[in-house]
């Protein structure tokens, strides 16, 4: 019961934009982890902690929590929980440079899906396939993503990957169409930044130096704005505090931070 209360306090603080406070409550929820029999709750807690670490770019800390989330949902045969946990784990593997592991996570996630298709998993696997020059497979995955997006604004991350695919396939007009749509209309700044980056690369390849310089300036300004909103060092700095806090004893660190 205490664990669930701490979890909900963590969720409230996370929703209010207080990641460090949320992290503290989630860690408190896991203080007696071995006594918690609710694996659905454990899966959510582990996944949220992993997500917060990943958001702050502390990927080496995110990894063990995300692995535990996958295990928790597997124990109760929660396929949807596993899909999201595997997707998030795949993202962390990718940020750590482990592309093969990321591909496996997304492939497993797709295999677990039933009637409910989660487009983001297809989109992310498509991006990984593009890096491996598996263009036809990537295009098929992106078609599935577009056919299953729930809201119009959700199409823009798919457009971004489509733009990259067409750019790398030499279909520049198609690439520009999808990338410009991201810049003009995508709700997330990360998606708009991706569009600017790829259009800048196209301009450089075409020798359009003034256009490339303009796009590069816009990209850097947007990237700086995104980074200012994510205080990546803050969570790293509080690790020293957590290490001496009752929340994290030596056994706790050995059990949860070892991958």
Would you name each region that the model predicts?
Residues 2-13, 25, 32, 42-53, ...:
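TPR/Sel1-like alpha-solenoid repeat signature
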């Amino acid at each position: 019961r205490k664990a669930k209360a701490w979890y909900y306090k963590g969720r409230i603080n996370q929703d209010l934009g207080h990641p460090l406070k949320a992290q503290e409550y989630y860690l408190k929820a896991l203080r007696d982890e071995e006594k918690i029999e609710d694996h659905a709750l454990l899966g959510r807690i582990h996944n949220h902690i992993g997500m917060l670490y990943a958001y702050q770019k502390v990927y080496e800390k995110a990894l063990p929590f995300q692995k535990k989330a996958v295990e928790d949902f597997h124990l109760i045969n929660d396929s949807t929980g596993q899909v999201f946990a595997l997707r998030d784990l795949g993202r962390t593997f990718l940020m750590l440079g482990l592309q093969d592991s990321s591909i496996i996570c997304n492939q497993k996630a797709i295999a677990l899906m039933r009637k409910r298709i989660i487009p983001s998993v297809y989109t992310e696997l498509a991006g990984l396939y593009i890096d491996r020059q598996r263009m036809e497979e990537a295009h098929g995955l992106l078609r599935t993503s577009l056919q299953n997006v729930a809201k119009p604004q959700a199409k823009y991350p798919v457009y971004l990957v489509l733009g990259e695919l067409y750019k790398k396939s030499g279909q520049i007009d198609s690439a520009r169409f999808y990338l410009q749509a991201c810049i003009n209309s995508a709700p997330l700044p990360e998606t708009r930044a991706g569009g600017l980056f790829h259009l800048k690369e196209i301009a450089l390849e075409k020798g359009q130096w003034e256009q490339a310089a303009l796009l590069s300036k816009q990209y850097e300004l947007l990237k700086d704005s995104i980074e200012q909103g994510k205080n990546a060092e803050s969570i790293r700095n509080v690790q020293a505090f957590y290490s001496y806090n009752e929340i994290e004893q030596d056994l706790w660190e050995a059990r949860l931070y070892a991958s």
